């Protein structure tokens, strides 16, 4: 599936649900307590992060989308910390303050990247008047493209059915991260996003893919859902919709350090993408990519548009764009470990034109990754003459790196990239023009390594020299 990142700045999302403050105490552990057989942590760092529904709102804001948050808090330091931290990341908070209850707080103690214990400070908000929340939803509906209901069973969504119907009447899709085994309370929602254990707690244990799909589709029908997205950890995600074939998205996670808040990231990216105009299938693809990024971070985290862009292009771990030769070697090694085919080409690319773009796009189609090696300014001057290059090396590389077809851009100082090609040893070496394969610098090294050498045609009439001559001719007429 080819998906382009939407302009999230055009999207507005309201998150309603159980907000909480996540506190983290970090420190080294070097001994066991004499009081009990437990480690002693010498706390040297304390962090506070918005969690629960607040983490969903932060994930939406991190993408650049308009993010609004409604929830229940106490009147205490934790509530003030939430307001302050969310304000810093452009989340518009409209909390309902309940003076008789504390703000939900979860304290985690960690040492050496391992969580040792979690302590919860909370009292349920059950029985709280729902009208202030309903009124806040009604006020926000004209300004949003999606409503997220983030349920942690703490009481903020006690009247969830009223919220669903209110949004549906306004034509706003409702996405719900469910809690518990009573999915009937979410009847009529646009999308539910249970994880596998939550799904099987309702539908029963599924031994096969067919069984999972069959039971999932039954839930969709029983509860009048538009769609069901089952998040399945290392098995990826499965999207079920009435009248459509199941869509399975394999996981994109490379390493898993912490799954805290991963579900918040999934539904946040889903909502922002839908509000920005992406179809549901594309929104799920983006959410799956975002989940693969966030589980590689410690603690509740967000994903930026750049991280998401890297992930959907499969470059989150290897990097992309302009690189040194050493950085490129490491990136190529990681790509090869995943079985990816490396394509390499080279040139001056002084004034980028349609012929270059078409050529690079065709080169990229030959494999999974495209390296563009670029002549330095001195090298270009030796090859093209004293008036070249028109554009200096840094500018040429930045423009090349911005092309969708190009993964990595690397400079070289010599007249030919033979040494660089021998160092990288691409699977396919490509050159444009009227060359014979044996005339291409680096071809012998690539062939000796079992690789291929190909010649691609340039578009007729497209050349840097022609562009320069046209500019000169027009200038002489004026």
From Swiss-Prot:
Pathway terms, separated by semicolons: Nucleotide-sugar biosynthesis; ADP-L-glycero-beta-D-manno-heptose biosynthesis; ADP-L-glycero-beta-D-manno-heptose from D-glycero-beta-D-manno-heptose 7-phosphate: step 1/4; Nucleotide-sugar biosynthesis; ADP-L-glycero-beta-D-manno-heptose biosynthesis; ADP-L-glycero-beta-D-manno-heptose from D-glycero-beta-D-manno-heptose 7-phosphate: step 3/4
Q: Which species is this record about?
A: Pectobacterium carotovorum subsp. carotovorum (strain PC1)
Region entry Cytidylyltransferase: which residue ranges?
A: 344-478
What Gene Ontology terms for biological process does this UniProt record contain?
A: ADP-L-glycero-beta-D-manno-heptose biosynthetic process
List the GO molecular function terms: ATP binding; heptose 7-phosphate kinase activity; heptose-1-phosphate adenylyltransferase activity; phosphotransferase activity, alcohol group as acceptor
For the region Ribokinase, what residue ranges are annotated?
Answer: 1-318
Q: What is this protein's function per UniProt? A: Catalyzes the ADP transfer from ATP to D-glycero-beta-D-manno-heptose 1-phosphate, yielding ADP-D-glycero-beta-D-manno-heptose.
Task: Tell me which CDD domains the record gives.
Answer: RfaE_like
**Assembly behavior:** Homodimer.
Q: Is Phosphoprotein set as a keyword in this record?
A: no
The Enzyme Commission number assigned here is 2.7.1.167, 2.7.7.70
Task: State the family it belongs to.
Answer: In the N-terminal section; belongs to the carbohydrate kinase PfkB family. In the C-terminal section; belongs to the cytidylyltransferase family.
Q: Which InterPro entries match?
A: Bifunc_HldE (IPR023030), Carboh/pur_kinase_PfkB_CS (IPR002173), Cyt_trans-like (IPR004821), PfkB_dom (IPR011611), RfaE_dom_I (IPR011913), RfaE_dom_II (IPR011914), Ribokinase-like (IPR029056), Rossmann-like_a/b/a_fold (IPR014729)
For this entry, the protein name equals: Bifunctional protein HldE
* Gene3D superfamilies, alphabetized: 3.40.1190.20, HUPs
């Amino acid at each position: 599936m080819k998906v382009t990142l939407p302009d999230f700045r055009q999207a507005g999302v309201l998150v309603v649900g159980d907000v909480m403050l996540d506190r983290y105490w970090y420190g080294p552990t070097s001994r066991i307590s004499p009081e009990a057989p437990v480690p002693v942590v010498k706390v040297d760092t304390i962090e506070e992060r918005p969690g629960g529904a607040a983490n969903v709102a932060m994930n939406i804001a991190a993408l650049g989308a308009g993010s609004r948050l409604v929830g229940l808090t106490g009147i205490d330091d934790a509530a003030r910390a939430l307001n302050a931290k969310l304000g810093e990341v452009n989340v518009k908070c409209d909390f309902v303050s309940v003076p008789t209850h504390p703000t939900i707080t979860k304290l985690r103690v960690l040492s050496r990247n391992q969580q040792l214990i979690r302590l919860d400070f909370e009292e349920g908000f059950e029985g709280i008047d729902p009208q202030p929340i309903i009124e806040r939803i009604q006020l926000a509906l004209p300004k949003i493209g999606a409503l997220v209901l983030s349920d942690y069973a703490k009481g903020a969504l006690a009247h969830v059915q009223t919220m669903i119907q209110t949004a549906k009447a306004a034509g706003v899709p409702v996405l719900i991260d469910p809690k518990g085994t009573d999915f009937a309370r979410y009847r009529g929602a646009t999308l539910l996003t249970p994880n596998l254990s939550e799904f099987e707690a309702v539908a029963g244990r599924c031994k096969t893919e067919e069984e999972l799909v069959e039971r999932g589709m039954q839930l969709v029908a029983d509860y009048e859902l538009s769609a069901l997205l089952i998040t399945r950890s290392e098995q990826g995600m499965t999207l079920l919709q009435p009248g459509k074939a199941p869509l399975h998205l394999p996981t994109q996670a490379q390493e898993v350090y912490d799954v805290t808040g991963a579900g918040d990231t999934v539904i946040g990216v889903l909502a922002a993408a839908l509000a920005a105009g992406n179809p549901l299938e594309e929104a799920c693809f983006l959410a799956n990519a975002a989940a693969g990024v966030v589980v590689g971070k410690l603690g509740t985290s967000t994903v930026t548009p750049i991280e998401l862009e890297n992930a959907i292009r499969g470059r989150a771990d290897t990097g992309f764009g302009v690189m040194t030769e050493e950085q490129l070697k490491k990136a190529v090694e990681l790509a090869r470990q995943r079985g990816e085919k490396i394509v390499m080409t080279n040139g001056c690319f002084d004034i980028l034109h349609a012929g270059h773009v078409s050529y690079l796009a065709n080169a990229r189609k030959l494999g999974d990754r495209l390296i563009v090696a670029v002549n330095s300014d001195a090298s270009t001057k030796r090859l093209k003459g004293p008036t070249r290059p028109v554009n200096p090396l840094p500018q040429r590389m930045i423009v090349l790196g911005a092309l969708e077809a190009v993964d990595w851009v690397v400079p070289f100082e010599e007249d030919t990239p033979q040494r660089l090609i021998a160092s990288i040893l691409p699977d396919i070496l490509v050159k444009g023009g009227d060359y014979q394969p044996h005339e291409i610098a680096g071809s012998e090294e690539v062939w000796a390594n079992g690789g291929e050498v190909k010649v691609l045609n340039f578009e007729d009439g497209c050349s840097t020299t022609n562009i320069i001559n046209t500019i000169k001719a027009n200038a002489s007429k004026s």
